[in-house]
Design a protein with these regions (language model features):
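General beta-strand structural signal in soluble alpha/beta enzymes
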Residues: 5, 42, 68-73, 93-94, ...
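N-terminal small/polar loop signature for handling phosphorylated ligands or for N-terminal nucleophile
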Residues: 39-104, 185-247
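Phosphate-binding and adjacent anionic-ligand microenvironments
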Residues: 271-450
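Gly/Ser/Thr-enriched, mixed-charge loops and adjacent short helices
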Residues: 104-229
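An N-terminal, well-structured beta->alpha segment
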Residues: 1-59, 63-65, 143-169
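Proline/glycine-rich low-complexity loops and linkers
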Residues: 71, 123-155, 159, 250-322, ...
Length: 450
């Protein structure tokens, strides 16, 4: 099956994955993670296939002697919170995240919300599933226990609020699991919000729940622009609410690495000297802002499982990824889009400037954006060529792909990575000036496309 991905299990329901597959995956997960006889949190999103897939997954866990802690409809951050706060042995989130309605899947964790990725277990689970018929006798007799964590989760997230004045926010839930996150804003008088698409609908009828694609933000932008001065900013959640995109009070998109810098700035006020991670595609201003705010900036490779591992190893309080994942030590070193929302609200409430003016200094340098190139030459050969060409001209390192750091000598940095799933090479580059960026961008693209 091609459903076993780098970070989760995902496919088109009824075509790539079925209830029978989910039953086997559940049993394989229980065996691999060693949770037989233990307690596992299971949450699900609002897709039309999620209920029946939950029933099959729960049956598989029960047949491995697992007590299933069924938290019902919930966001991925809520499932992480339940895993950690209930001291469970693992958690499962049934979701296909931002994928369209035809898809479904699951995200698997061990205890303390430690993710199981392709590199740390998904491939092992795939092998176990391949050896199953689905008619194996039970290895135990577990049970299903319904647990409601929504109120506790809301209280947990609200601890992040330290607003100096009222802040009014526009929220686009895209008919997805951001709706479950709204519990985090109940009982907080200083943060109020107006909502778009706040009814669960697994068909996602209004737009895809993917804030990484700017076109999905159009309705949120239109709401803000139709009401000048009403909203401090807007937030759009993805399908399972572990990612968020933000727009300012004018409806203009805030780049996600800028959001990383702003959130770190807020957190470091109460955590001086703490480590904050930014992913290696981020603007240099993320690193500089963290340092200027009294923090210790550290660069991470791309991918949530890698980032979480690096955060734990370095006792980091926060990490931000260019994809819109924002990770908090306070949420068991996992994502919380609502904590990110509170962090921005905290910043706005403490300033006499609107968010657009707080973002402006972060535009100091010139970024290429991510440029993807389909190549005939094997991507590994291209990366090796870049490493050889620049080894004597700059600091070259291989945290994720090949990075070339000539910031001090020539005023630019570049990162060239392979796609995990396609024959693509991805280039991200930033220059101290637009002229430097464009010249170096063209130089690197000429090598990649040769």
């Amino acid at each position: 099956m091609g459903i076993f991905k780098a970070y989760d299990i995902r496919g088109i329901y009824g075509q790539d994955l079925t209830e029978a597959d989910f039953y086997k995956i559940a049993r394989a997960y229980a065996q691999f993670a060693g949770v037989q006889g233990g307690r596992v949190v299971v949450a699900r999103d609002c897709r039309k296939s999620s209920d029946s897939l939950f029933e099959s997954f729960a049956k598989g866990l029960v047949d491995e002697g697992v007590t299933v802690l069924d938290i019902g409809l919930g966001s991925t951050p809520m499932s992480y919170f339940a895993n950690g706060s209930l001291k469970a042995d693992g958690s499962v989130m049934i979701t296909a995240s931002h994928n369209t309605k035809e898809w479904n899947g699951c995200k698997l964790c061990k205890a303390n919300a430690v993710p199981i990725s392709g590199a740390t277990g998904i491939k092992d689970i795939e092998k176990l599933v391949a050896g199953m018929t689905g008619s194996e006798p039970p290895n135990g007799q577990g049970r299903i226990e319904k647990v409601d964590v929504s109120a506790a989760y809301g209280e947990h997230v609200r601890k992040f609020a330290h607003l100096a004045r009222p802040v009014h926010v526009a929220m686009d839930f895209a008919n997805g699991m951001g709706i479950a996150e709204s519990v985090a804003f109940k009982g907080q008088d200083l943060l109020t919000h107006d909502d778009l698409y706040g009814e669960y609908d697994g068909d996602f009828p209004n737009h895809d729940a993917n804030p990484l694609h700017v076109e999905t933000l159009k309705d949120l932008q239109a709401l803000i622009r139709a009401n000048p001065g009403k909203y401090a900013f807007g937030v759009a959640y993805d399908g399972d609410a572990d990612r968020a995109g933000f727009v300012d009070e004018k409806g203009d998109v805030i780049p996600m690495d800028f959001t990383t810098a702003l959130i770190a700035q807020d957190l470091l006020k109460s955590n001086p000297g703490a480590v904050c991670f930014y992913d290696l595609r981020s603007t240099k201003m993320a690193e500089e802002t963290i340092a200027a705010s009294g923090g210790r900036p550290m660069m991470s490779r791309v991918g949530h499982s890698f980032i979480k591992e690096q955060m734990r190893q370095n006792d980091a309080i926060f990490a931000g990824e260019l994809s819109g994942h924002y990770y908090f030590k306070a949420n068991f070193t996992a994502e919380s889009s609502s904590m990110a929302t509170y962090a921005l609200a905290n910043i706005v409430s403490a300033s006499d400037k609107p968010l657009s003016e707080l973002v402006e200094p972060l535009k100091k340098y010139s970024q290429s954006g991510e440029i993807n190139t389909k190549t005939v030459t094997p991507p590994a050969e291209i990366l090796a060529k870049i490493k050889a060409l620049y080894a004597d001209k700059a600091r070259v390192f291989e945290l994720d792909g090949v990075s070339v750091d000539a910031w001090e000598s020539e005023g630019y940095w570049a990162n060239v990575r392979m796609s995990n799933t396609e024959p693509l090479v991805r280039l991200n580059l930033e220059g101290k000036t637009k002229e430097i960026m464009e010249a170096k961008r063209d130089e690197f693209l000429a090598i990649i496309r040769a």
